[in-house]
């Protein structure tokens, strides 16, 4: 009898394990690009529109336009890289506004040689300063695209492509497949091309409308998890009611003793600092990243300081510091999540837009620099920081300084989720303290501590 029950138990355990394994395989295989989204921008994506504008004797001419519909994630230098696989034996005769990185084997062609004969071409944007006869609208920005909220006018990129050895009608054309997008690194997942209604174009005088011969769309979504990137930013915290300054977590973006030669750090007190940061090199040499030696080893630190408390308002100071000696950030942006962001009264020296990732939930805001004033975050050094203050109106039903409520729930810099300190380390409200009172000692010591913290 005992052997019967032991065999039954063994069979049940094996069946349970098999069932769990099948569920895991099903859930893994059902993952699609639509699930690779950002919680604070659930509908954000990059949409590519492929418009066939005219037919040629052996193919077609198309205009490909990429729209960055992500609210705050932009594509920085060195820009996007687009790839796909042809459905048949298509070639690219010519391109305007972009180019392939390799020509491939075009040895079977005599006379006119195609621009690219590869089955899986890789396309990049042309650089600024390209001759006008090689440009089209929205091209030639080095692959850089701004986010939709920050600057929609520069959130698109286009190029023209002439395809040969392809179909010459709507019924014979085969759409490319296996699209890939690097922006500039990994993290984007692209879905299949879907044929949609042809795009319509209105002339500048608005008196005539034309349309493409054929149109298909490709949608790409981003996931920081798929990008498998180490964190690039961290958050530190302080407050007027507690002299404790909570720094970024140790090794938040890496540890000094684990850094390789290409990712070395530099002490700010190093003699001849400028010559170490910018050594003599051959033309075209790209220097590896070089960050300031810190406990956290992050290129970017965001400091959130609860500065003042009034009867009906409270004030926060935000400071963004760049610790990267060889990289500055043009048109940077910051996204913060906090329950009181629906009651912003005034923000100083930054642009601001409320984001509502979900209906009825207004706890997320996007901040970015004022053009020609502080939209440029310089490399590490005396000028490598930008700062602003935010004035909030209190909602008496929810406002408190207790249990870390005054600190952000999440911070993103340039679309990357920043490492937060553990909640149990947040500056706490002293015992017996109130919302409007704090110790005299804290008031005296805190400015000194903040000074030494940022000068370190």
Curated annotation (Swiss-Prot):
Signal peptide (UniProt feature, chain positions): 1-36
Lipid attachment residues per UniProt (GPI-anchor amidated asparagine): 431
Entries under Pfam families matching the protein: COB_C, COBRA
Keywords: Cell membrane, Glycoprotein, GPI-anchor, Lipoprotein, Membrane, Signal
Removed propeptide positions: 432-456
Localization per record: Lateral cell membrane
Cellular component terms (Gene Ontology): external side of plasma membrane; lateral plasma membrane; longitudinal side of cell surface; plant-type cell wall
Record carries keyword Signal: yes
Domain of life, source organism: Eukaryota
Glycosylation sites noted in the Swiss-Prot or TrEMBL record: 45, 170, 178, 217, 242, 258, 328, 343, 362
Gene Ontology BP, a term: response to salt stress
Tissues where the protein occurs: Expressed in roots, stems, leaves, flowers and siliques. Up-regulated in the root zone of rapid longitudinal expansion.
Topology of the protein relative to the lipid bilayer: Lipid-anchor; GPI-anchor
Other facts noted in the record for this chain: A partial protein missing the N-terminal signal peptide was reported to complement a yeast mutant defective in phytochelatin synthesis. It is therefore possible that COBRA binds divalent metals.
Family (UniProt): Belongs to the COBRA family.
Protein name: Protein COBRA
Organism (species): Arabidopsis thaliana (Mouse-ear cress)
């Amino acid at each position: 009898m005992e052997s019967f029950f032991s065999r039954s138990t063994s069979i049940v355990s094996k069946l349970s394990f098999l069932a769990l394994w099948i569920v895991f395989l099903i859930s893994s295989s059902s993952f699609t690009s639509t699930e690779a989204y950002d919680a604070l921008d659930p509908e954000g994506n990059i949409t590519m529109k492929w418009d066939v504008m005219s037919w040629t004797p052996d193919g077609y001419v198309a205009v490909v336009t990429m729209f960055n519909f992500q609210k705050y994630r932009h594509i920085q230098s060195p820009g996007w890289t687009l790839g796909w696989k042809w459905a048949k034996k298509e070639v690219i005769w010519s391109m305007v506004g972009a180019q392939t990185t390799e020509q491939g084997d075009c040895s079977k062609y005599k006379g006119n040689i195609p621009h690219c004969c590869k089955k899986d071409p890789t396309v990049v944007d042309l650089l600024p300063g390209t001759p006008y006869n090689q440009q089209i609208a929205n091209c030639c920005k080095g692959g850089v695209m701004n986010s939709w909220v920050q600057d929609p006018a520069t959130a698109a990129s286009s190029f023209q492509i002439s395809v040969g050895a392809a179909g010459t009608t709507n019924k014979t054309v085969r759409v490319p497949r296996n699209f890939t997008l690097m922006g500039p690194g990994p993290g984007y997942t692209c879905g299949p091309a879907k044929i949609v209604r042809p795009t319509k174009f209105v002339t500048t005088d608005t008196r005539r409308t034309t349309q493409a011969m054929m149109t298909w769309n490709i949608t790409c979504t981003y996931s920081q998890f798929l990008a498998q990137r180490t964190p690039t930013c961290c958050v530190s915290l302080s407050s007027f009611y507690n002299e404790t300054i909570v720094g970024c977590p140790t090794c938040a973006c890496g540890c000094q003793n684990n850094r390789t030669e290409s990712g070395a750090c530099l002490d700010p007190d190093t003699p001849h600092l400028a010559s170490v940061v910018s050594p003599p090199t051959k033309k075209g040499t790209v220097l590896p990243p070089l960050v300031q030696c810190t406990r956290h080893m992050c290129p970017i630190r965001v400091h959130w300081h609860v500065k003042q408390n009034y009867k009906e308002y409270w004030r926060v100071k935000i400071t963004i510091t760049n610790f990267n000696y060889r990289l500055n950030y043009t048109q940077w942006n910051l996204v913060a999540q906090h329950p009181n962001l629906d009651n912003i009264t005034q923000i100083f020296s930054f642009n601001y837009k409320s984001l509502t990732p979900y209906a009825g939930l207004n706890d997320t805001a996007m901040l970015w620099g004022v053009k020609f004033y502080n939209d440029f975050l310089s490399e590490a050094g005396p000028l490598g920081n930008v700062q602003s203050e935010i004035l909030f109106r209190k909602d008496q039903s929810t406002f408190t300084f207790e249990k870390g409520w005054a600190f952000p729930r999440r911070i993103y810099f340039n679309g990357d989720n920043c490492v937060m300190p553990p909640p149990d380390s947040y500056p706490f409200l002293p015992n017996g303290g109130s919302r409007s009172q704090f110790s005299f000692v804290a008031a005296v010591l805190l400015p000194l501590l903040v000074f030494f913290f940022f000068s370190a």
